[in-house]
Amino acid sequence: MQRISLLLVMALALGGCGHNAPDSDSDINAYPANYKPDILAAMHAYLNDPTGIRDASISEPVLKSSLSRYVVCVRFTAKKNAKEYAAPKEIAAIFLAGRFDRFIDMPKDECAGVTFTAFPELQKLTP
């Protein structure tokens, strides 16, 4: 009897782990309506010094078949140290269920053919 009770408790506990999982593929691929604020927030963790960014540009979210996820490409030039800038960089922000999931460094296929527009908000980040 104790084993059955223990198994029931464990099943209920593990059942709660999947509580916030997306219901379907359409939920997983929800359009990232707040993609700019999500990217700005993530850049604070991604960059050692998020201030003084130059030449920032961004693409609109595009559903890429290779990943089956929405992708937003970002170009920018960040500080290398207090006196120098690094080379221009391009990264891809991957979205899952309409929320930022991760960055991909040196994207090739993910950013092929996208159109970039100015992203002044990224250039105004504070520490």
Predicted regions and their residues:
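Cystatin/cathelin-like cysteine-protease inhibitor module
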Residues: 18-127
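Sec-dependent signal peptide recognition
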Residues: 2-7
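C-terminal motif of bacterial Sec signal peptides marking the signal peptidase cleavage site
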Residues: 13-16
